[in-house]
Structures are given as C-alpha cells and as structure tokens.
Amino acid sequence: MSLTRLLIKDFRNIENADLALSPGFNFLVGANGSGKTSVLEAIYTLGHGRAFRSLQVGRVIRHEQESFILHGRLQGSERETSIGLTKDKQGDSKVRIDGTDGHKVAELALLMPMQLITPEGFTLLNGGPKYRRAFLDWGCFHNEAGFFNAWSNLKRLLKQRNAALRQVTRYAQVRPWDMELVPLAEQISRWRAEYSAGIAEDMADTCKQFLPEFSLTFSFQRGWEKETDYAEVLERSFERDRMLTYTAHGPHKADFRIRADGAPVEDTLSRGQLKLLMCALRLAQGEFLTRESGRRCLYLIDDFASELDDARRGLLASRLKATQSQVFVSAISAEHVLDMSDKNSKMFTVEKGKITD
C-alpha cells in the first residue's frame, strides 16, 4: 500500500500543503530548517499518532494555532483507503478512516507499516535495550494479530504491580497480578523469540552485503533467566522488587544484542558503519514483512547523505529500489539524490515551509 496523497495543515512550519506522491521515490530537497524533515515527520505522525522529534504535541503544532490536521490516501492492490489524524495542544486526538471517526492510532499503524532512518537513529544500536525491544515489537505487531492487545495488557499489569509493591508486605498480596502477568509475559517472549529467529537470516544476508568486513551475530534475551519459569522468578524476586518498588525481571527488560566480531557493535563500528548497519536492519525488517505478509513498508530517510560515501549511498539506493516500496528521502542538495531518481520518482523543493514540485 502506498501513500498517493498527503495533506498537511498547521504542522511544524507548514501552514498548508497538498502533495500528489509517487508510489516509488519521493525526494524532499531544501536547506536546513526549510521544512523537509517536517514532511517526513508528518507522514510518520499520520502512521503513529506522534512525532519522532518531539513527544510534546505543542511543539509540532504551528505557532499560534490550536491543532494540526493530517490527511492521506492509501492505494492498495484492490482499494483506496482514506485516513486522517487531528491533534490539539491538549493532546486530544481524532482518528478517521474512510470517513468514520472513533478509530485508534494502532489501526493507522497497521495500515501504514513504515521504517524510519534518521541521523538520530543510532539509538537502535548504541542506546538502551528499550530501542531494540521496540525493533522486535514492531515486527511482532505486524506479524502477530494478538500482539498489540497482549502488549497493552502487559504494560497495564506491570504498572499496577509496581504500584502494589509500594504498599504490600507479603508475596501473596501481589500474586493476583502475577497470575495474569505470567501467561502474557511468556506469550510475548515467545513471539519475540520466534520473530528474532525468523528474521535472523534476512539480517545476516543484508548485513553481509552492507558490512562484509564484519561477522555479525544477533541474540535475543528475554529479560529473565533461561530455563526458569517466570512465575518462579517473580516469587523469588519479590523482596528485592518490593525494595526497588518496581518489577526487575520480565519482558520489559528484554534485549536484542548485536555483536560484530564478538564485540558490541557500538564499541567496534564507526559512525558510517553504524549507519549502514542501521539501514541494513531496517531493510531486512521491511523485506521480512513483505515475504511473510505480502505487505510493503514505507521508508522515511532523513538526511540521506549523512555519514555515507557515494558507493554506500548507491548500495542503499539500489537495495531500496529492489524492495519496490514507497520511499521518502530528504537531502540538502538535489545532487545527493539525482542518481536515485527515475521517470517514476518525484522531486519536491522545500523552502520556509512551502513545498513545490
């Protein structure tokens, strides 16, 4: 499914924009601060309900306005879908799909699977475990129909259990939460383990093409000891959890470790190599989705030339074209993307929030 039309109103520095888009490559060219990243962020927000540069909604609403409006048309193989998102300064959202209100942001995310590659995206590799859990959970969300509800219930139960730990003195007092928590935790961990195992070959093949000089390995760690029942871990850790006032073990502590030649990638690879690895992982994830479900990812790439030389930019461009996915690329200069363009691509110029093609 590709985004054929995008309407933006009062988002960042963009007052109004109505863009007819290519199902292939779409290039956004402009100086720093022109608004090209804001277009990428508008697309991301339409599919996630939140921006990727700020969690504070007031910062993405145009100055002196009360809300932003985003609208898109998605073209699938058999039908067109209309989607919209409105959000005000209080954080209240309204999601519309095919003209009807009352929908959830998760429905937008299912309709618009997308991969984001930004200069700040190194956190996937050198940030905390939560970024790598998010990587796995993206895949589980799009591959397992029950994942989102299970994950939402897990978060709710952990919050309730942590609150209870501040008030109780005996394990029996938190057992009711644990009886619900354990099966959810084990199911989510199984999904994550299955997904990480399923995508491992795709990641290895893609990384070998991007970084042939390294031997890369991937390992999923579920968040508690191997070969130990989660129920046993919770009961055994109760006193420590009560002192900490939070649950120290579980799927919320899982990680997905990536090593190069046996060492953590953040200690081994240069910034340029880290960006290549990040691109390889995002590509592998999108290609795995297509193979498993027939759906294609939408790729958002901010500051395409950053950290990459001409040869590596060419490699990334050729791999993206091979996916036959819709791609949005921002760049300071058209020269950085001219060799990627073809008769089906579109070039947009962005200047002070105004977008022309």
From Swiss-Prot:
The keyword Transport does not apply. One of its GO terms (cellular component) is cytoplasm. GO terms for biological process: DNA replication; DNA synthesis involved in DNA repair; double-strand break repair; SOS response. Pfam families: SMC_N. Keywords: ATP-binding, Cytoplasm, DNA damage, DNA repair, DNA replication, DNA-binding, Nucleotide-binding, SOS response. ATP binds at residues 30-37. One of its GO terms (molecular function) is ATP binding. SUPFAM superfamilies: P-loop containing nucleoside triphosphate hydrolases (SSF52540). It is found in: Cytoplasm. InterPro entries: DNA-binding_RecF, DNA-binding_RecF_CS, P-loop_NTPase, RecF/RecN/SMC_N, RecF_2. It comes from the Bacteria. NCBIfam families: recf. Belongs to the RecF family. The RecF protein is involved in DNA metabolism; it is required for DNA replication and normal SOS inducibility. RecF binds preferentially to single-stranded, linear DNA. It also seems to bind ATP. This is DNA replication and repair protein RecF.
